[in-house]
Amino acid sequence: MVKGLELFEVPRQVVFGPNAIGKVSEVLTYLGLRRGLIITGHIHSRHIASKVSEQCVDCQIISDDEIELSDVVKGMSAFSDVDFIAGVGGGRVIDVSKVIAYKLNKHLISIPTVASHDGIASPYISFLMQDDLNKLGVGKVRKTPLAIIVDTGIVAEAPRVFLLAGIGELLGKKVALMDWRLGHRIKGEDYSESAAMLALSSHMIIMNNVNKLTRHGEEETRIVVKALLGCGVAMAIAGSTRPCSGSEHLFSHSLDLLAREYGVKQAMHGMQVALSSVIMLYLHGANWRRIIKIMKMLGLPTSFKELGYDKELVVEALMNAHRIRPDRYTILGSNGLTREAAEAALEQTGVI
């Protein structure tokens, strides 16, 4: 069958490596950007944001906790005359920046200070933030960064737990791709070979560098950043998160919703994805033991108990996971797992 016209946006300029933060002025000049709104966090990322502001012609800095999602939905008209929105910080900062850039129809510059997730380069925001926006009447947020600047020296200074979360995110891509192919074969879902290969390449970057990643430095940070950037571009090409988000993410999202409902502290996204991948590889009949071995080598948690979740919450989340995105077919099927099947998978893999 002949496909119709395809259109996707990818970042126009990507700069990463030591001292990349010093290239902000050069990037902005190249892109013709002058006036900007910089969204950032506190202390460390605020300091980095100041370095970014010094290289702008006219930039204002505000903290993400000063911004309510309801304000963003109303439009933030006070900033309608800026050329770009820059996110300088972690996951929430980058997500808030995407939402503002999307609502104001402005260019987005992504300047992450941690490498904990693939949102640093993708057009999409976190599941929970999108869920909150849906309740406010906002549709699917999609905003591809025009430029991405990652100073690997700065990212390497962040606590190792953030890098481990990024690695955990990348370990899950194998499952996402297996599920995507399954959905393509069984439900006729659109499938992009180029996006799939890019996501697989990102996964393999981690698998091929496990021994190196037992260390923590700029070189190891660069490996993870490069893989996360590849995932972001894969999602942009596919026009969805499908190349990088399968049943392992459905389970993680289900955990997030239940944790919020029951008032349980949520674990880091990448940690949940890594553990969820073990379960889904088991269900696929794939080599889940290899992932557990890698997680132990790198110091990632290998049980949900380590993440602070009790057995009942985890079982319930696994049983509900298929309901998160019913439009996406995965190894969980249309009806999900029975309690017996969920408990068996958790016990057989030893993650409970």
From Swiss-Prot:
Main location: cytoplasm
CDD domains named in the record: Gro1PDH
Known pathway: Membrane lipid metabolism; glycerophospholipid metabolism
Cofactor binding: number and manner: Binds 1 zinc ion per subunit.
A GO BP entry: glycerophospholipid metabolic process
Compartments reported by the entry: Cytoplasm
EC identifiers of the protein: 1.1.1.261
Gene3D superfamilies documented for this protein: 3.40.50.1970, Dehydroquinate synthase-like - alpha domain
GO CC, alphabetical: cytoplasm
GO molecular function terms listed in the Swiss-Prot or TrEMBL record: glycerol-1-phosphate dehydrogenase (NAD+) activity; glycerol-1-phosphate dehydrogenase (NADP+) activity; metal ion binding
Cofactors, names only: Zn(2+)
Catalytic activity: sn-glycerol 1-phosphate + NAD(+) = dihydroxyacetone phosphate + NADH + H(+); sn-glycerol 1-phosphate + NADP(+) = dihydroxyacetone phosphate + NADPH + H(+)
Annotated substrate binding sites: D118, E169, H253
Residues reported in the UniProt entry to bind NAD(+): G91, R92, V93, I94, D95, T113, V114, A115, S116, S122
Annotated positions binding Zn(2+): E169, H249, H269
Family to which the UniProt record says this protein belongs: Belongs to the glycerol-1-phosphate dehydrogenase family.
HAMAP family xrefs: G1P_dehydrogenase_A
Quaternary state and interactors: Homodimer.
Function recorded in the entry: Catalyzes the NAD(P)H-dependent reduction of dihydroxyacetonephosphate (DHAP or glycerone phosphate) to glycerol 1-phosphate (G1P). The G1P thus generated is used as the glycerophosphate backbone of phospholipids in the cellular membranes of Archaea.
Annotated protein name in UniProt: Glycerol-1-phosphate dehydrogenase [NAD(P)+]
Organism this protein belongs to: Caldivirga maquilingensis (strain ATCC 700844 / DSM 13496 / JCM 10307 / IC-167)
Gene: egsA
